[in-house]
């Protein structure tokens, strides 16, 4: 199960470490390079809801196998593409296969584990999947620098074929069934499931949580982090790969902790999301405000903050799971998963356009160019923050109306525990 997501993340992030090589190979500027990743994410995001509907009908196994083979085809095409057209088609295939993988893996979790363990297992799934970023940051980057472009991407394609075979041999949709199919698809059923999932404010809270928490880390890992560190901050390729590896390892360490917190404090999940968003904003603020190039220690702080975004965005899927019945879980999960990738593709495109505007389309960036371009993330984050605060209010009202559960203000709860009084300080 997890291996499918590991390889999907490898495919998804492969362009990030190959960004500078891709500019040389295809003779394109930052805007055109960004368009590769934007198109990949656009395909991914556009397919989330259709894939979610198909997932509820056909089950996880079929979609995971199909997704792995489609991504493998995309990477094989990328290996031998010598022009922009081939590269664009390759990233479209990668985005399409990727769209079929993650939510299919997530749907397996409640089928195999009791409900009380789902938050932690969901985080562990995301944690293991991030090994794909390690594979792109280290061995794939080493293959690019050594054996070359074609060998690197053929190797990535081979990994996709291997995962498809492994899933066919070992994976089951549930302990009871190898392939679990839902009811036959009809237009009325599709429309009803989609409308009901969207109408629930808990689903939309999940979408905005995913939108806001995920995109800074995705933008960094998928395409702009490596060029920012190398061309902007002046790090060596090895040092940049090291920071990307730190990004992955930090996310892996944070995931289980966040899962336990969600499990123990289900009514305070949104505050975890808001805290992670604040960490992302402060991390970038420190780097952008630093005069000139930031020292390595400051860049480490940025990477540590951004690494929390991936595990934090997984809380959005918990909102989808707990606010929707099992028969439309795939649809609700697909809606939530659209959020972070829409935000990411908008940010990636805007950063590329700003860099091109400042350098005339040449790959001659300096740190000032990157600082101006990266600051656009604050505008996107502000939109997401507004969405979270509004839908949280609506979701809490719905929770009280449907289940009689009232979420008390956090400040009131903390005040009762003595956090805002001298009594608490005296006890510490």
Spans of model-derived segments:
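Helix-to-loop junctions at the C-terminal end of transmembrane segments
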Residues: 47-59, 254-268
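Helix-loop-helix hairpin linking two adjacent transmembrane segments in secondary transporters
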Residues: 124-175
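Helix-breaking motifs and short loop linkers at transmembrane-helix boundaries and internal kinks
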Residues: 27, 59, 80-86, 114, ...
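Juxtamembrane intracellular "pre-TM" segments in multi-pass secondary transporters
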Residues: 174-207, 406-417
């Amino acid at each position: 199960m997890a291996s499918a997501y590991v390889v999907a993340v490898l495919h998804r992030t492969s362009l990030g470490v190959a960004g500078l090589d891709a500019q040389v190979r295809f003779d394109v500027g930052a805007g055109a390079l960004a368009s590769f990743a934007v198109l990949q994410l656009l395909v991914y995001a556009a397919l989330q809801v259709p894939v979610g509907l198909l997932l509820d009908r056909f089950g996880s196994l079929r979609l995971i196998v199909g997704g792995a083979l489609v991504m493998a085809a995309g990477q094989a095409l990328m290996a031998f593409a010598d022009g922009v057209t081939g590269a664009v088609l390759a990233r479209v295939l990668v985005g399409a296969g990727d769209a079929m993988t993650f939510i299919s893996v997530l749907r397996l979790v409640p089928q195999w584990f009791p409900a009380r363990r789902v938050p932690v297992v969901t985080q562990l799934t995301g944690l293991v999947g991030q090994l794909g970023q390690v594979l792109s940051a280290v061995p794939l980057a080493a293959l690019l620098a050594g054996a070359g472009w074609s060998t690197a991407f053929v190797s990535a394609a081979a990994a996709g074929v291997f995962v498809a075979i492994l899933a066919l041999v070992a994976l089951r949709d549930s302990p009871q069934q190898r392939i679990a199919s839902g009811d036959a698809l009809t237009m009325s059923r599709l429309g009803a499931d989609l409308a009901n999932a969207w109408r629930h404010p808990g689903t939309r809270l999940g979408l905005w949580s995913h939108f806001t928490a995920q995109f800074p880390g995705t933008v960094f890992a998928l395409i702009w982090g490596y060029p920012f560190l190398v061309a902007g901050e002046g790090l060596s390729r090895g040092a940049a790969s090291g920071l990307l590896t730190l990004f992955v390892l930090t996310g892996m360490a944070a995931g289980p902790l966040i899962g336990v917190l969600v499990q123990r404090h289900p009514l305070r999940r949104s505050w975890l999301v808001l805290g992670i968003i604040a960490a992302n904003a402060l991390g970038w603020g420190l780097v952008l405000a630093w005069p000139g190039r930031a020292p390595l220690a400051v860049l480490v702080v940025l990477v540590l903050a951004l690494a929390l975004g991936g595990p934090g965005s997984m809380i959005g899927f918990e909102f989808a799971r707990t606010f929707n019945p099992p028969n439309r879980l795939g649809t609700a999960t697909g809606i939530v998963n659209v959020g972070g990738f829409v935000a990411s593709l908008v940010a990636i495109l805007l950063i590329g356009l700003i860099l091109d505007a400042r350098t005339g389309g040449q790959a001659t960036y300096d740190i000032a160019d990157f600082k101006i371009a990266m600051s656009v993330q604050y505008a996107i984050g502000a939109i997401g923050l507004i969405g979270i605060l509004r839908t949280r209010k609506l979701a809490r009202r719905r929770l009280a109306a449907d289940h009689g559960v009232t979420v008390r203000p956090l400040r009131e709860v903390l005040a009762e525990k003595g956090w805002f009084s001298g009594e608490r300080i005296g006890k510490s």
